[in-house]
């Protein structure tokens, strides 16, 4: 996955494998943290956007689909949602969605790069919203791999892996060893959720993520939707559980609690998204 970022007459373009995706606007900030290159860009169409290592990560007016689709299939379906672990998620969007549920008592958000949090709070405050001041959110500026490795068994009801593409500091978040550790610290009846790349632009990576999850968990399935600032626009999330698939059947009480506060996700949307599998991907998934 080799990315390049270029500017041209008021545009910022991400280049990858012969494809260019650009937004018109202006550059606000560009710096390097100890872990990655961070860019903040103000686009005319989607508002302020965050890029990591020259990849579009999130933008104010296009982030709802990504965050709602990563969080709610897991939290609406898990047996309990008292204790949540988020790996990554430094923009605050995943925490914001989790905190819509009154049942949630504690969220450990483990982000390796403090600058991602600081710059998101300063330049993209609407994404995290009130999550940053919620007493249920515990920020841990640490390595997520190490955090999971040293956490005791059955610690979390839901685990959310909200990492970037499998390059740089996020690469190991897709490894067999890390996901096995996630299974170990997930409580019975719990659900794991992860972003799982574009099935069109990164088909091999997407299939491999689902394959690893199915090797480790009894049940694992991808779900598909649209995220306009990502390569090809077609994106995926994968969900895993040790119980017959917990992530497909939302609890009615939770649906009622959060549905009016969602822009994309709904119970009907979730059911459709799990069944709307591109034919070429379905054939590949049948092989694993």
Curated annotation (Swiss-Prot):
Coiled coil: none annotated. S-methyl-5'-thioadenosine binds at residues 36, 111, 143-144, 169. It comes from the Bacteria. The keyword Cytoplasm applies. Residues 9-242 form the PABS domain. GO terms for molecular function: spermidine synthase activity. The active site is at residue 162. Homodimer or homotetramer. This is Polyamine aminopropyltransferase. It comes from Prochlorococcus marinus (strain NATL1A).
